[in-house]
Amino acid sequence: MTPLLIASDVNIFYGEKQAVCGVNLNVQRGTVNALIGPSGCGKTTFLRAINRMHDLTPGARVTGRITLDGEDIYGPRVDPVTMRRRVGMVFQKPNPFPTMSVFDNVVSGLRLAGIRDRDHLMEVAERSLRGAALWDEVKDRLKTPATGLSGGQQQRLCIARALAVEPEILLMDEPTSALDPASTARIEDLMTDLKKVTTIIIVTHNMHQAARVSDTTSFFLNGELVEHGPTEQLFTSPRDERTEAYVTGRFG
């Protein structure tokens, strides 16, 4: 099966400093893929390259090639805004648009794309909120401010907002690090359901979380991808001694 995402010799620089070195990684469609490693190892830097967020950082530069369904996402004819609709992003801390209602948050991306039909927007909002396991909790509060939701609900709202534009890949950068255990469990369960409709790449410092939710895991260290493979294999019989040292808690 041809991978949905292929990263080939990806290098990322901030000015003269190289933050990611020669990463090669394939991601299959309909899977959850965890990126693990100590702080500053390059995993989030690599994640942000997948939807061209480094375009917004002065002095940042990405070399190599990343293809999404065969298309080079850094190709000269690729519109970064269009690409970011194909590659959704959920950040570490919930970030609903504070001046918008729950409903307006979910459909904001569609409105930016010029979609105005109210019935269609409502249909997408309900589908996305159901997909984020939030509909039953907010269906009577769609016109209320999103900031009135709990932290866990706000994060699921951000997931619904990302799902509304039907991304091919959903990137999640430490999506549960600011949440309580119950909210974390809800989002972990949600990831298992979401891979039926999209592909997920999650950065996490929580190795137990990676083991619970992911199909494959990639271990980053000092800007390099040290090892990538099926999650169970990487945690129980890693090929590289550096991976073993990290997953057994000898460093990191």
From Swiss-Prot:
Record's GO cellular component terms: plasma membrane
A Gene Ontology biological process term: phosphate ion transmembrane transport
EC number annotated for this UniProt entry: 7.3.2.1
Enzyme class: translocase
Residues annotated as domain ABC transporter: 5-247
Localization (cell): Cell membrane
Topology with respect to the bilayer: Peripheral membrane protein
Binding-site list for ATP: 37-44
Disulphide connectivity of cysteines: none
Pfam families named in the record: ABC_tran (PF00005)
InterPro entries: AAA+_ATPase, ABC_transporter-like_ATP-bd, ABC_transporter-like_CS, P-loop_NTPase, PstB-like
Catalytically driven reaction(s): phosphate(out) + ATP + H2O = ADP + 2 phosphate(in) + H(+)
SMART domains: AAA (SM00382)
Gene3D superfamilies assigned to the protein according to its UniProt record, in alphabetical order: P-loop containing nucleotide triphosphate hydrolases
GO terms, molecular function: ATP binding; ATP hydrolysis activity; ATPase-coupled phosphate ion transmembrane transporter activity
Keywords associated with the record: ATP-binding, Cell membrane, Membrane, Nucleotide-binding, Phosphate transport, Translocase, Transport
Function summary: Part of the ABC transporter complex PstSACB involved in phosphate import. Responsible for energy coupling to the transport system.
Assembly information from the UniProt record: The complex is composed of two ATP-binding proteins (PstB), two transmembrane proteins (PstC and PstA) and a solute-binding protein (PstS).
Family the UniProt entry places it in: Belongs to the ABC transporter superfamily. Phosphate importer (TC 3.A.1.7) family.
Protein's UniProt name: Phosphate import ATP-binding protein PstB
Organism annotation: Deinococcus geothermalis (strain DSM 11300 / CIP 105573 / AG-3a)
